Each structure stands twice: as structure tokens, then as C-alpha cells.
Curated annotation (Swiss-Prot):
GO terms for biological process: negative regulation of translation; translation. HAMAP family: Ribosomal_uL13 (MF_01366). InterPro entries: Ribosomal_uL13, Ribosomal_uL13_bac-type, Ribosomal_uL13_CS, Ribosomal_uL13_sf. The gene is rplM. This protein is one of the early assembly proteins of the 50S ribosomal subunit, although it is not seen to bind rRNA by itself. It is important during the early stages of 50S assembly. This is Large ribosomal subunit protein uL13.
Length: 142
């Protein structure tokens, strides 16, 4: 019996919508990363993108435990000398709530071209509305 290897052109991808309201950030992100990679499928192949498309709504209502709301700090660099910037979780939720989930999931995906391809299948929206109704996404309860 030969080992099954999925081919990129034969992979069937589904669309799912996830409501992030009240979900813990890390627990949500691990499940999203797992599904973006395709590890929940029997035909999972490490070097082939077998994952599904995921739409996350209500990113502004994601929760963190403990004092992370004020203690968790996000850092980035502007590219200029001395341009290191930071913001707490609370400030990031106020400024750009989609980025909080995107950063968490991106860190859990493989680094390199395959990981970037997987990350492109994640669509995050701050509010309750998304513009992917034509794809007829199924509701995924995490």
C-alpha cells in the first residue's frame, strides 16, 4: 500500500465562518491555524496547502484571560531609526481589532511561501458583516 500524497489541484476547500465573540484569543487562534493548514482532514500533506478558507467575524469582541488586556504588548518597527512602536492589547482592539487575531494566527503557521499561502485564506472582520456571502460559508462552532 502506498502513502497518499495530496495534489494541490485536487484539494477541495470549504468556506467557514467563525464568530469570535467571547472566545479566548489563543484557543481560537490554534484551531484557526489547524484548519488553515488542513490538519483536520484525512488527506493532510505537510508540503501541500490542504486547508480551508476561514472568515472570522466580531474580532473586536475576542477575549483574553487574566490581566493580558493591559499587560500584553504588541511591538512593531516603522523602518526609521528609533522607530520601535508598541501598543497594549486594549489599544490594538480599539485601533485595529483584526490585527490581533491575524498576528496570533500568523505566528502559528509555517514560515515561508506555504505559510503565506495559508495565511491568505484567513479573512478577519471587526464587525458582524463580511462580504463573502457568495461563497456560502458554513458556520463553524469553535
Amino acid at each position: 500500500m502506498k502513502t497518499f500524497v495530496a495534489k494541490p489541484e485536487t484539494v477541495k476547500r470549504d468556506w467557514y465562518v467563525v464568530d469570535a465573540t467571547g472566545k479566548t484569543l489563543g484557543r481560537l487562534a490554534t484551531e484557526l491555524a489547524r484548519r488553515l493548514r488542513g490538519k483536520h482532514k484525512a488527506e493532510y500533506t505537510p508540503h501541500v496547502d490542504t486547508g480551508d478558507y476561514i472568515i472570522v467575524i466580531n474580532a473586536e469582541k475576542v477575549a483574553v484571560t487574566g490581566k493580558k488586556e493591559t499587560d500584553k504588548i504588541y511591538y512593531w518597527h516603522t523602518g526609521y531609526v528609533g522607530g520601535i512602536k508598541d501598543a497594549t492589547f486594549k489599544e490594538m482592539i480599539a485601533r485595529r481589532p483584526e490585527a490581533v487575531i491575524e498576528i496570533a494566527v500568523k505566528g502559528m503557521l509555517p514560515k515561508g511561501p506555504l505559510g503565506r499561502e495559508m495565511f491568505r485564506k484567513l479573512k478577519v472582520y471587526a464587525g458582524n458583516e463580511h462580504n463573502h456571502a457568495a461563497q456560502q460559508p458554513q458556520v463553524l462552532d469553535i
